[in-house]
Regions:
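Anion-binding and metal-coordination hotspots
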Residues: 1-161
Length: 161
């Protein structure tokens, strides 16, 4: 990993490391050093390393939103670990300003029976397909794709797409 800023302004990028520390009752029970620039991909290896070193299996894991990802939630569930981990957009989503953004697709009305959203202009946005992608760590993520059939000539098209 490299630092994002060149503090010396000489064109040399400095190496950076991501330190993870696990605690229980305010005592450090383990730490790891990673080259990953984000916390998301350090969660599972750090948890496994600490459990291995301590020779135990955790029942609970608490982490901040930076660790929230589908892969991490899936890992916790499969390993029967109760996780208290906010998802990354939680703080943004609870704000009134976020909920007032009518063209944000997360605020659109969803009809589970029809499996379609309704855009702010009243047009149906039906389910089209499911796409599976492999992330850098090899985890398969599944996405549902929805597509409006009647966007031609809509004056708000740029706000939706």
């Amino acid at each position: 990993m490299r630092m994002k800023e060149d503090h010396m302004l000489n064109g040399q990028l400095k190496p950076g490391y991501n330190i993870q520390v696990g605690t229980e009752n305010n005592f450090v029970i383990g730490y790891d050093v990673f080259p990953n620039p984000t916390d998301t991909r350090t969660f599972i290896p750090h948890l496994e390393n600490v459990q291995k070193r301590l020779g135990c299996k955790f029942k609970f894991a608490i982490a901040v939103a930076g660790y929230g990802s589908e892969e991490n939630y899936d890992y916790l569930e499969k390993n029967e670990i109760t996780g208290i981990v906010k998802y990354t957009t939680y703080e943004k989503e609870i704000k009134r300003s976020f909920r007032k953004k009518t063209f944000n697709t997360e605020n659109w009305k969803y009809d589970a029976e029809q499996k379609e959203y309704t855009c702010p202009c009243g047009n149906p946005v039906p389910y089209r397909m499911t796409v599976t992608k492999k992330n850098k760590s090899g985890y398969l993520q599944t996405y549902e794709v929805y597509q409006c059939e009647n966007c031609e000539g809509c004056p708000f098209r740029e706000l939706c797409t």
